[in-house]
Amino acid sequence: SVALVACATAFVVTLAGCGSDSKTSSASSSSTTTSSVAQPLASSTTETAPAEPASACPMTPPANGGAPEWTLRGTTGSVAVTGSTATAAPVVTVTAPFSVTETQVHTLQPGDGPVVASTATVTVCYMGVNGRDGSVFDSSYERGEPVDFPLNGVVPGFQKAIAGQKVGSTVAVAMASADGYPDGEPRAGIAPGDSLVFAIKSLGAA
């Protein structure tokens, strides 16, 4: 339902998050974890899903895992990100624990639309991964539907990732705790100090 889809965005949109008592951890091998999609967070009615086709956020990762478009060595650990395509979800591979002290944004594929303002309301597909253990804490790709929200209502790191990019861009951000949830978000399994990684596809802005 729209309400259930909407709730998943509340975590990114608000500093408090909506969360649930469970989170989805991806399969892991040794200290390296590859993440694709997660289950949505608990219900909220603060956001609505836009009337976009489900294919806008492909649900299935590439069969071969995809070639990384960005690799980053952190203060600890490392991350490799393959952005989404028209037919495949993104892949985020974390060598845990991954952490950064400064937020870093990388454009995986530039778009050709207008530049996104810092106060815009955006339509995006996204996947969020916890650098501490490689678990996916939220993903609109799992639901197969994009979401929209105002950039002035999101955590700072998410705004830094999207504002200034062109619509149509595929972006990755390694987010320092200070730009995410410095005090943690227990309902999403985020502890104080956790660095977060997002793979994002910008579909529209108004």
Language-model-derived ranges and their functions:
Residues 1-206:
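Cross-family detector of peptidyl-prolyl cis-trans isomerase
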